Amino acid sequence: MLTRRHIMGALAASAAAPAAANAGLPADALARHALRPMEALVGRTLILGFLGDAPDAPGADAIEADLAAGRIGGVLFLRHNARTREGVEGLARRFREAAPDAWLAIDQEGGVVQRLTGDMGYTRIPRAQALAEGGLDAARPLFETAARELLEAGFNMNLAPIADLHDAGNDAIGQYGRAFSADSRDVAQWCATFIDAFEAQGIACAIKHFPGHGRSRGDSHDGYVDITATWTFEEAAPFGRLMRLGRAHLMMGAHLVNLRLDPDGLPVTLSRRVLHGLLREVMGYDGAMITDDLDMGAIRNHYSREQALTGALAAGNDLILISNSANPDPDLARRAVDWVGAALVAGTLSVQRLAEANARLDALAAHLRPA
């Protein structure tokens, strides 16, 4: 059994002497990606948001052009993009035509975080806490219906489920009933059932928010959140159980600081100690990593977009989410290539790291394809 001493020792070792992060990735895939143009490697890691809620929205023009040129690998839909069924499905069709294999990502947890709502004609998904009270047998067909509807609407990535532990005093999750339980075994069982329903439709599920956001005090949408005093290793347990159950193929890290896990004070999103040292080396995760939105206050208030994007890639993230709505930049995808190029020259990022990210995205897509 892994002890706290073992884990902390591994984190220190990871920071002092970074090891290869490509365990389990095919050597031929890594070699192939390492020879691809940098623009293609970077573009595939980017999932950008936009302004607009209809297919003819000006913000959709730049997204369509970026998709068609391979400058981005996917599109993030937020609440302001999903106001009507006709609008959101029309946008999804437009983007899918531009890039058939692109990730179209949206939050469809249920409860207060359900972008395709009942008012728009989709099935209402109760909040996780309410679902848990009704039991798995009642929830399973609801998850299956929600997954079919999401696919029919044009999406292939759900930024859910929540694998955090319930704590009523939590500002971002607990007070809204977004977590299934305070028990790690129950949380893992519920998340596995949720994932099964969506993956059966070929939809990727981003399990969030590693290493656990449930007992935090503060909301990283608004600003800096330090979990050093509140976090325990129990909060990482649901993520570990999902790995052992074979359900963890895409995971989202949190914009949280834990000085016990990273004494440098880097948020998890930018911390190699946590994403590589804890998650991959200690816990054995071999799936893909996706950031939470880098435009959230916890990141935006402390780092430039260049620092956040290149730092997130260097830390071990394979997909980068940027809503691009707080300060919209139609040239963000092009700038990202320049930023990564500068990081490569500076030695803070490597082509090998980009190749690893692309190889993991290959594996994620292959997992979701019908047998």
Q: Each predicted region: which residue ranges?
A:
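Glycine-rich, aromatic-flanked loop segments that form ligand/cofactor-binding clefts
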Residues: 96-123, 143-166, 187, 195-211
